[in-house]
Each structure stands twice: as C-alpha cells, then as structure tokens.
From Swiss-Prot:
Protein name: 3-isopropylmalate dehydratase small subunit
Entry keyword annotation includes Lyase: yes
Keyword Amino-acid biosynthesis: yes
InterPro entries reported in the protein's UniProt record: 3-IsopropMal_deHydase_ssu, Aconitase/3IPM_dehydase_swvl, AconitaseA/IPMdHydase_ssu_swvl, IPMI_Swivel, LeuD
NCBIfam families for the chain: leuD, PRK01641.1
Gene3D superfamilies according to UniProt: Aconitase, domain 4
Class of enzymatic activity (EC top level): lyase
A Pfam family it matches: Aconitase_C
HAMAP family: LeuD_type1
CDD domains assigned to the protein according to its UniProt record, in alphabetical order: IPMI_Swivel
Length: 201
C-alpha cells in the first residue's frame, strides 16, 4: 500500500449528502475480488447516461474537462453510507483519488478507506463549504493535505486542522494495511508461538 504523508492535488466537489456505497460503485460491478479496474465504474449511474457506460453524462462533474485528473474529492455529510463493500474505496482509489473530505463518514466506509490507503478527512460543514466554494470558483484550484501536520490548506491558503486516531495515522504514513501492520509484529508473534506448550500447538 502506498504511504501517505502529504498530498496536493486538483479537487472536485460533489455537493451531495448521504452518498452511499451503491452510488459509489453499483452492485453489478462487484464480481471481481482484486482491487484494480473499478475506477471506470466509479459513480457509474451518475457518470453515464446508459447502462453500458458508453455515453458520459456531460453534466456530471467528473466528466468535465476542468476536473480531469482530480485527486481530492469534496462531499457532504454521511459519505459512504449504505451496505458494507470494500469495493467503494477500491473504486475511488483506482480512479486516482487520494483523499475524500466531508463533514462525516459512515463508520464502516471510514475504516475500509484507511485500510486501503484512502485518507478520509473530517472537517466542519462550514469548512467543507468554503473548500467547495473556492474549488468551484477557481479553475484548477488545488487543495493540500498534510497528514504529518494534520492540516488541510485551501486554494486561498486557509488552514483547517483535522484529527485522526494515531493507529490509523500510523498505518497511512507507513503504507500499512491490516496484514502489513500485523507483519510489523513478526518477532513478537514468533516469540509467542515458540512458547506455546506442545499440547496446545
């Protein structure tokens, strides 16, 4: 998993609340169990006018040329609600997004995002709205996110602090998923296993 320390990138706003996992990646695209190839289906029902995904919806922000290459997504509260599917952060990451900023996230999505190297940042409603206004008002507006300093910097230079539990921050800074984090305790695990009584082994 790619480590995350700081990132500056083009930001795009989807000014909607309660964006659920079925909107992020519809259920008909969940048959794969590998993480790649989901980006093309991200927000499928909003991005395309047809079921085959051959007719882009020109009104949807991710299809607009000014947001091509966006790596930071801004959204409203309760992002990632709905059914638990790890494919949702897979699709966001495969599309090229590194950060999602919103006033709140569904708990399961929040954990899945961190476990897959996608940084979910919680800011206040007013701060998210300011970011959206700046991004929508300036062509090519970039937002910076510093995980070491726990700061978001808006296109105008406004700084917004955010918090993240230290265990999640450690995982992202070091590029560790759940398996990778477990492997960092390899010596302790081996020492424990070496002391297990034979009758329990």
């Amino acid at each position: 998993m790619q480590a995350f320390t700081a990132h500056s990138g083009l930001a795009v706003a989807i000014d909607s609340a309660n964006i659920d996992t079925d909107q992020i990646i519809p259920k008909q695209f969940l048959s794969k169990v590998t993480r790649d190839g989901f980006g093309v289906h991200l927000f499928h029902d909003w991005r395309y006018l047809d079921d085959a995904g051959e007719k882009p919806n020109p009104e949807f922000v991710l299809n607009q040329s000014r947001y091509k290459g966006a790596s930071i997504l801004l959204a409203q509260e309760n992002f990632g609600c709905g059914s638990s599917r790890e494919h949702a952060p897979w699709a966001l990451a495969d599309f090229g997004l590194r950060v999602v900023i919103a006033p709140s996230f569904a708990d399961i999505f929040y954990g899945n995002a961190i476990n897959n190297g996608l940084l979910p940042v919680v800011l206040t409603q007013a701060q998210v709205q300011q970011l959206m206004d700046e991004v929508q008002g300036e062509l090519g507006a970039q937002v910076s996110v510093d995980l070491q300093l726990l700061r978001v910097i808006s296109p105008s230079g406004a700084e917004f602090p955010f918090s993240l539990v230290e265990s999640a921050r450690h995982k992202l800074l070091n590029g560790l998923d759940a398996v990778g984090e477990t492997l960092t305790h390899g010596q302790a695990i081996s020492a424990y296993e070496a002391n297990i009584p034979a009758w329990l082994a």
